[in-house]
Amino acid sequence: MKIIAYGIRDDEKPYLDEWVTKNHIEVKAVPDLLDSSNIDLAKDYDGVVAYQQKPYTADLFDKMHEFGIHAFSLRNVGLDNVPADALKKNDIKISNVPAYSPRAIAELSVTQLLALLRKIPEFEYKMAHGDYRWEPDIGLELNQMTVGVIGTGRIGRAAIDIFKPFGAKVIAYDVFRNPALEKEGMYVDTLEELYQQANVITLHVPALKDNYHMLDEKAFGQMQDGTFILNFARGTLVDTPALLKALDSGKVAGAALDTYENEVGIFDVDHGDQPIDDPVFNDLMSRRNVMITPHAAFYTRPAVKNMVQIALDNNRDLIEKNSSKNEVKFE
């Protein structure tokens, strides 16, 4: 058995080597992301492992089928950049890593919220320019807030577990309710109720056709003045121009974003001194009440180890058993 893994970073390599030593399976590590220029490297391999934000194009799976490869494993959760029709057409099974470290993402979302509540970006800016006064940048306390969690899967529940000890009131919305949270009476029946009651809204749902721009101008209009928005899920959940308008009006007091709807080509790139040709993104970056991280909420040592080794486990199982506990089946 031979596996080829694309987009392997230096920080992933030790965990890949550890897995190879333990499993006695050959794995070729390719540093470049998977695309049409390097798919031919997969010839003579039994499975492909990958992780990237840019789209996987249909021709890649045609090539895999041509090479006799029927096992494709992602080192991440999201499948929104994978063409399901191409997988079905080429009889390729796909797996993901549904939970590599929910706490990593939840912890950063809470960290960024605390920084916004206490005006940390504002103080950093002022002090860098010689202004050491605390006024007028008075902060807020999380124990006085109502946090609305949209999506109560692994990450959403981890976020709830962190918010509650701070003394925040937590309410939640999910189409699929968690029985334990329901017993606590945490759920509201509609998103509108959550928008109206919460002054912090945090997103922890996958990107689907039905939730594209779920936070749009109408949704922002239903929120309290001075609401804080956290998006550590998928960029397409937020209508960014509508968010900018809500920030301008004061409807939104601040936003912490680990994702952006047009992030491909912006995040995970060293731009140096070159300007980014995206006026909407540049507007976000110019605001001291907006904190942006480059889709890095997952990026902890435990998470990276899990992403690499669980993906390789999945790929091995797809090759050996034609199935994996983390196989994703499209309808």
UniProtKB/Swiss-Prot annotation:
Keywords: NAD, Oxidoreductase. The keyword Hydrolase does not apply. Transmembrane segments: none annotated. The active site is at residues 234, 263, 295. The keyword NAD applies. InterPro entries: D-isomer_2_OHA_DH_cat_dom, D-isomer_DH_CS, D-isomer_DH_CS1, D-isomer_DH_NAD-bd, NAD(P)-bd_dom_sf. GO terms for molecular function: D-lactate dehydrogenase activity; hydroxypyruvate reductase (NADH) activity; NAD binding. It catalyses: (R)-lactate + NAD(+) = pyruvate + NADH + H(+); (R)-glycerate + NAD(+) = 3-hydroxypyruvate + NADH + H(+). NAD(+) binds at residues 154-155, 174, 205-206, 211, 232-234, 258. PROSITE patterns: D_2_HYDROXYACID_DH_1 (PS00065), D_2_HYDROXYACID_DH_2 (PS00670), D_2_HYDROXYACID_DH_3 (PS00671). It holds the Pfam family 2-Hacid_dh_C. Its EC number is 1.1.1.28, 1.1.1.29. It comes from the Bacteria. Has both D-lactate and D-glycerate dehydrogenase activities. Equally active on pyruvate and hydroxypyruvate. Belongs to the D-isomer specific 2-hydroxyacid dehydrogenase family. PANTHER family: 2-HYDROXYACID DEHYDROGENASE HOMOLOG 1-RELATED. Homodimer. This is D-lactate/D-glycerate dehydrogenase. The lineage of its organism: Bacteria, Bacillati, Bacillota, Bacilli, Lactobacillales.
